[in-house]
A protein has these predicted regions:
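Membrane-embedded transmembrane alpha-helical bundles that form the catalytic cores
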Residues: 1-461
Length: 462
C-alpha cells in the first residue's frame, strides 16, 4: 500500500484512524502494529514475513546486548553477530544480483541467477533496527522489554516504506504514552496534504518533463540542463513530499518525528546541503560509521579515508549499481575539497553566488544518481558541457522551456522557506483561508490521482 493512492486515502486511513481514536489508549499499540502489518502486506504479502523476522530478531538481540552489559567480550560478539545477520539479509535481497554481475564482469564468467524483487523499505527498517542495537551497545538507551512496543517501532507504517530513519531514542517515551487530540491531528493532516501536493502536483509533473527530455537521442546544452533541473526538483518534491506525509501521519497518531528536509536547495555549500538533505540518513552514517572510524579526530589521511568510506557506503545504500557508488564518491571528494581548499573562499563571496555554486554541484551530482548506465551517464554529462550536443540551444529546448516554465518556476519558489512562512502567518491571521487552501490542494491532488497513472515514490526503491 502507498500513501498516494485512492484506496489508502479514502479507505485504509479513515477506517484505521477512526478505530485508533475510539479504542482505549492501552490498545492503540496493538492496533498500530496490526494496521502496519496490513499496510505492508497489502503490497508485499510474502515479504511481511521478512519484516516480522527482522522485528523478532532485533528485539531478542537487543535484550541480549543489555543482558551482557558487564561482559564486554560477549556483548561485542553479539553485536557483530547482529550486524552480520541484518546486513546479510539486506545484501542478499538488494545486492545479490549486483555482486554476481560484478564478479562475472571481472572474471568474464556469466553466473546465472534468478532476479529477486527488493522488499519495500528493507534498507530503511534494517538501518532503523541497527540504530536501536547500536544505541543499546553504546548505553544510550535501555532495551525494550515489551515485544509489542518494539514491534510498533520496527514496523510503524508511516515510515516503513521510505523513511525517515527514526531513532528509537527519539520516540522511546512516545511508544509508551503519547498525546492525541484534534489540534495535533489537524497539524498532521495539513502536513500530509502538503506532502501529497508536493508529490502529485509537482514531482509527478516534473517526472513527465524530465522523461520527455531524456527521450531525445540528441539534445542541446540548454535542453540537458533544463532536463536535470526538472529531475533536481522532482527528486526533492518526491522525497520531501513523502517525508512530510510520513511526519504528518505520525502527528495524527500522536508521534513527533524529526524533520528529514530543511530546504536543502538554499544551501551555500555542499557540506550545508548534506546537513539539510535526508537528515535522518546523514546523521545515521555520521553517528554509526563516521564517528566510530575516528571522524575528524584522526590524522589528515585517516580523516580523508573516513569521509570517502562513508560516502561510498552512502552511495551504495541508495542502490545496487556502480553509478550510486560513483555518486557517493563524487560528494565525498567535494566535501574534502570544501574542507581543505574552498571553505575560506566560500566565506568571502556573496551567499547567492555560493548557492549557485552549490546547486551546480548538486545538479551534476543528480546526473550520476539518475543514470544507471555508464554510457548514458557519460553522454548526458558530455551534452551538458557541449560534448556531442546539438548546439547550445535549439527548438526542442525552447519548446520545453515554454511548456515547463510555469512548473519549474513554481518548483523553484516552493523550494524556499518564504512560501511556507507566509502560509504559517496566514494560519495565524486567517485560519479559514488556510483551511480553504489546504482543501483546494487536496482536491487538486485527488483529481490528478484519479485521472493520471500511478507514479511510485522514487525513494521507495531504495
Amino acid at each position: 500500500m502507498v500513501f498516494n493512492s485512492i484506496f489508502f486515502i479514502f479507505c485504509f486511513l479513515p477506517v484505521f484512524m477512526l478505530i485508533y481514536y475510539l479504542v482505549p489508549g492501552k490498545l492503540r499499540n496493538l492496533l498500530l502494529f496490526l494496521g502496519s502489518l496490513i499496510f505492508y502486506a497489502w503490497g508485499e504479502p510474502v515479504y511481511v514475513i521478512l519484516m516480522l523476522f527482522s522485528s523478532i530478531f532485533n528485539y531478542y538481540m537487543g535484550t541480549e546486548l543489555e543482558r551482557l552489559y558487564y561482559d564486554d567480550r560477549k556483548q561485542k560478539i553479539n553485536l557483530i553477530f547482529s550486524i552480520i545477520i541484518n546486513l546479510a539479509v539486506l545484501v542478499f535481497f538488494k545486492y545479490y544480483g549486483f555482486l554476481l554481475n560484478t564478479i562475472g564482469g571481472i572474471t568474464g564468467i556469466h553466473i546465472p541467477h534468478p532476479e529477486l524483487s527488493l522488499p519495500i523499505g528493507l534498507s530503511f527498517y534494517t538501518f532503523r533496527n541497527l540504530s536501536y542495537l547500536f544505541d543499546i551497545y553504546l548505553s544510550k538507551v535501555s532495551a525494550q522489554r515489551n515485544f509489542l512496543t518494539f514491534a510498533v517501532y520496527s514496523t510503524m507504517f508511516p515510515y516503513t516504506s521510505a523513511g525517515p530513519i527514526v531513532r528509537y531514542t527519539d520516540i522511546e517515551t512516545q511508544l509508551k504514552q503519547r498525546t492525541i487530540n484534534i489540534s495535533k491531528f489537524g497539524i498532521g493532516a495539513e502536513l500530509f496534504v502538503k506532502g501529497l501536493a508536493k508529490k502529485v502536483l509537482l514531482a509527478d509533473n516534473l517526472s513527465i518533463l524530465y522523461s520527455s527530455i531524456c527521450g531525445h537521442p540528441q539534445m542541446s546544452v540548454f535542453t540537458s540542463w533544463l532536463g536535470i533541473l526538472a529531475y533536481t526538483m522532482q527528486l526533492y518534491f518526491d522525497f520531501s513530499g513523502y517525508s512530510d506525509m510520513a511526519i504528518g501521519l505520525g502527528k495524527m497518531l500522536g508521534f513527533d518525528f524529526n524533520k528529514n528536509f530543511d530546504y536543502p536547495y538554499i544551501s551555500t555549500s555542499v557540506s550545508e546541503f548534506w546537513r539539510r538533505w535526508h537528515i535522518s540518513l546523514g546523521s545515521w552514517f555520521r553517528d554509526y560509521i563516521y564517528i566510530p572510524l575516528g571522524g575528524n579526530r584522526v590524522s589528515t589521511l585517516k580523516h580523508i579515508r573516513n569521509i570517502l568510506v562513508v560516502w561510498a557506503l552512502t552511495g551504495l545504500w541508495h542502490g545496487a549499481s556502480w553509478n550510486f557508488v560513483l555518486w557517493g564518491v563524487y560528494y565525498g571528494l567535494f566535501l574534502l575539497l570544501e574542507k581543505f581548499v574552498l571553505q575560506k573562499y566560500l566565506k568571502k563571496i556573496p551567499s547567492w553566488l555560493c548557492t549557485i555554486y552549490t546547486m551546480l554541484v548538486v545538479m551534476i551530482g543528480w546526473v550520476f544518481f539518475s543514470q544507471t548506465d555508464f554510457g548514458a551517464l557519460g553522454h548526458y554529462l558530455g551534452t551538458m558541457f557541449g560534448i556531442g550536443a546539438s548546439g547550445f540551444i535549439d527548438k526542442t529546448a525552447l519548446y520545453y522551456l515554454k511548456t515547463g516554465f510555469i512548473l519549474l518556476l513554481i518548483s523553484i519558489l516552493m523550494c524556499r522557506p518564504a512560501p511556507y512562512q507566509y502560509f504559517k502567518r496566514l494560519v495565524r491571521r486567517r485560519p479559514v483561508a488556510a483551511v480553504i487552501i489546504n482543501l483546494i490542494l487536496f482536491a487538486l491532488s485527488i483529481a490528478y490521482m484519479v485521472y493520471n497513472s500511478y507514479t511510485p515514490f522514487l525513494y521507495a526503491k531504495f
